[in-house]
Structures are given as C-alpha cells and as structure tokens.
Amino acid sequence: VAAVKAGAAPLDAIICNAGVMAIPEPRQAFGWELHLFTNHIGHFILVTGLLDRLASPGRVVVTASNAHRRAPAAGIEFDNLTGVRGYEPMRAYGQSKLANILFTRELGRRLGTKGQTANTLHPGVISTGITRTLPGLAQAAMRMASPLVLKTAAQGAATQCYLAASPAVASVTGAYYADCNPSETTPIARDMTLAAKLWAESEALVARI
C-alpha cells in the first residue's frame, strides 16, 4: 500500500485477485482463519488503504466465486473466526468468498455518489496454481479436465477486465458478475446488515494489527 501511495498518479482501478484455497487443516493469521484473512482481510487492507488514491471515476473489482454458496448457514461465523470449530476446507473457502461479496456490496454503498464503483465476480474454474492445496487425486482430475472444461488464465481474467474498464458498467456498483454478465448470488450474500457487521469486524481487526 505504501509503495503504491508513493506514486504520483491516481488509480483508475483496484483489482483484488490474491487468494488461497482448500487449505487442508485449520490455520490462522492474527486470530482469523487463514482463508478469511488472506482472501478478505488482505483485500480489505489494500482497498481501504488506497481509496484516497482512487480516481473519480474509478473502480474497485474484487474476485469472489460461486463457491460462496458453500459458506456456512450463518454466512460469516463471527463466533468462530479462528475456524477451528467444524473446519472443512471448501466451507472455509466459501466463507471467504462470501466475505468478498459482502465487502464489495458495503464498499459500493459507502462510495455512494462519488463517481467510484465497486463490483465483484465469479471468474470461472480456471487452471491456475490456486488448486495446489487440493488433495492429489483432485489435482490429477483437474489436470485431466483442464483442456476440456477449465478456463485459461486469460479467459478467467475477462470479467475482471470488463468490470475494470468497460463503459457499459460505468454506473454499476455493488453487483456480482460472471462471464461479463450480471449473476445471482445466494440471499445471504445480499444481506446488508451482515455486510456492515463484517466491515466493522474487519476494521477492528486491522486496527489491532
């Protein structure tokens, strides 16, 4: 964040794409389960730290996933942020992807009429290194399927680029996209009370780091 802020030019877009997936055992960073910390808090720190450098108009694009459908029934388990209770790798990943969507919706609300937008997306199932923590059999199956059903990295980036640059979505904010089109989320991913609570909990954690 500091290195980017040291530059002179404003930012036309901030694209959040870092992530981890399917870590076999529960691990934590600063007391938060590692998927949730890396995939959500990392982006929260980056975006909130750079908002004062975001141009107007400017855009924030956050990579989520349809895996948000695998999040816990409560959405975000605030009483289990360590992730130790009932840990399951894809459930933890799903919670982090739900957090991406909730964060983006709340950010879009906060940006309001500033001429800045925030949107999120499902990139598709892509042949990248993020699957490296999957069990060996699952990795082998994905390698076999890759030429037939998996997107390339370039194809997976298409919706990110669309949301970051297309005039067609210049006034769209707080939305979820897939394959460059609006897409549906689970009802809990549209819960603005939950989104506001996640923002507050995220701010509290970042203040302690």
Task: Tell me what each language-model feature is.
Residues 1-134, 209:
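Rossmann-fold NAD(P)H-dependent dehydrogenase/reductase core
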